[in-house]
């Protein structure tokens, strides 16, 4: 059972890193569930304090993820249409078979959303840039946290490799 927990924990850690880029999967929280599974393993020991701290960070980043793109859009004069367009553009960008669709999609989505909001093209372009910048900032933060979690996970396994490799 311990091997199952450890393998599933690694899977969740890697899925969390991937989830940093996907809007439907909360990256740091998914990675945190990897810590939770590792915590339940009898072979690998680490403190409950680390588990609680990483949970608090993951929840904080998850909440922040909803505000950063909106703040970017607002700072550059964007509307709710631009923010919705960013999300729709991200989903389309993920599905579209074009290189860099994950980056082009949110920008185009925000631009189209602002144009639908009857903004002039200069305002729409500025707001689209703000939404896109907010999206990139949020994605970068989630990616960094998920990578730190993966690094901690590897460090915990490495420090207790004797127990893990004795299987």
Positions of PLM-derived features:
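Transmembrane alpha-helix interface/packing and boundary motifs in multi-pass membrane proteins
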Residues: 12-30, 89-99
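Juxtamembrane boundary at the C-terminal end of a transmembrane helix
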Residues: 151-167
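Helix-adjacent hinge/juxtasegments
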Residues: 49, 53-93
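Final/C-terminal transmembrane alpha-helix of multipass membrane proteins
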Residues: 135-156
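Amphipathic, cytosolic membrane-interfacial segments at TM-TM junctions
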Residues: 70, 74-79, 115-131
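Interfacial segments of multi-pass membrane proteins
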Residues: 30-46, 88-96, 108-117
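Short, non-helical or kinked segments that cap or interrupt transmembrane helices
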Residues: 21-31, 75-84
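Alpha-helical transmembrane segments of multi-pass membrane proteins
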Residues: 16, 38, 57-66, 93-94, ...
């Amino acid at each position: 059972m311990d091997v199952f927990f450890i393998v599933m924990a690694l899977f969740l850690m890697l899925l969390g890193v991937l989830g940093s880029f996907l809007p439907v999967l909360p990256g740091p929280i998914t990675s945190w569930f990897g810590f939770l599974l590792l915590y339940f393993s009898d072979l690998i020991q680490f403190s409950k304090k680390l588990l609680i701290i990483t949970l608090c960070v993951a929840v904080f980043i998850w909440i922040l993820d909803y505000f950063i793109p909106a703040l970017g859009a607002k700072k550059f004069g964007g509307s709710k249409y631009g923010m919705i367009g960013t999300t729709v553009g991200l989903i389309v960008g993920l599905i579209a078979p074009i290189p860099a669709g994950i980056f082009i999609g949110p920008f185009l989505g925000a631009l189209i959303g602002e144009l639908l909001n009857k903004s002039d093209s200069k305002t729409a372009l500025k707001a689209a840039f703000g939404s896109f910048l907010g999206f990139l900032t949020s994605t970068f933060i989630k990616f960094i946290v998920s990578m730190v979690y993966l690094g901690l996970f590897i460090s915990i396994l490495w420090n207790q490799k004797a127990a893990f490799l004795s299987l």
